[in-house]
């Protein structure tokens, strides 16, 4: 073999090694970024891993659940004296709920403040809005959130993850979207009514 051919092969091998090393480094950076983003998520689980979300707004509980096929429906409240019943998810309403919850599932915690229960400067000790998220078929919530007032910046809202010693801020539009969802589907006839 000529020296030129050997030089070309050595150059080719060096380029291949460089490409492999660059790819590994980019994967490591991407993994680290994804891990740090996950640490800022408000919800402790992916939306696909949740079976129900309850939003209490001014004393009224609004429950959203997934049916056996995984479609969301507005459940409403049952008195406990009712017999076994099933629900049918309206595809249009299910899509509307899925869209709102997909957005809520992406909620990121922005800032963090120490909780001072006596001062209640964020109004999270007696909130008008309280959110609970559940895994499928579980009675105890996976996480609970007391939603406080809108921050002075007008675009953030204070939220207390129950059990935390810190109040966090999230984008206020996430709460607005949940309240708009309640207004849109909470009053629709047929949603939450048992099918016997």
What spans do the regions from the language model cover?
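A short-motif feature that recognizes glycine-rich, charge-decorated loops
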Residues: 1-196
């Amino acid at each position: 073999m000529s020296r030129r051919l050997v030089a070309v092969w050595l150059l080719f091998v060096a380029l291949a090694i460089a490409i492999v090393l660059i790819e590994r480094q980019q994967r490591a950076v991407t993994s680290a970024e994804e891990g740090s983003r996950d640490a800022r998520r408000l919800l402790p689980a992916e939306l696909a891993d949740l079976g129900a979300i309850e939003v209490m707004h001014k004393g009224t509980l609004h429950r959203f659940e997934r049916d056996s096929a995984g479609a969301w429906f507005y459940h409403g409240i049952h008195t406990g004296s009712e017999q076994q019943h099933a629900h049918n998810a309206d595809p249009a309403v299910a899509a509307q709920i899925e869209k709102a919850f997909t957005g809520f599932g992406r909620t990121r915690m922005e800032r963090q403040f120490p909780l001072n229960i006596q001062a209640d400067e964020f109004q999270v000790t007696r909130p008008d809005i309280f959110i609970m998220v559940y895994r499928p078929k579980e009675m105890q919530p996976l996480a609970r959130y007391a939603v406080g007032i809108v921050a002075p910046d007008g675009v953030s809202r204070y939220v207390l993850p129950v059990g935390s010693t810190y109040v966090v801020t999230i984008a206020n539009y996430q709460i607005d979207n949940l309240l708009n969802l309640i207004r849109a589907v909470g009053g629709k006839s047929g949603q939450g009514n048992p099918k016997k």
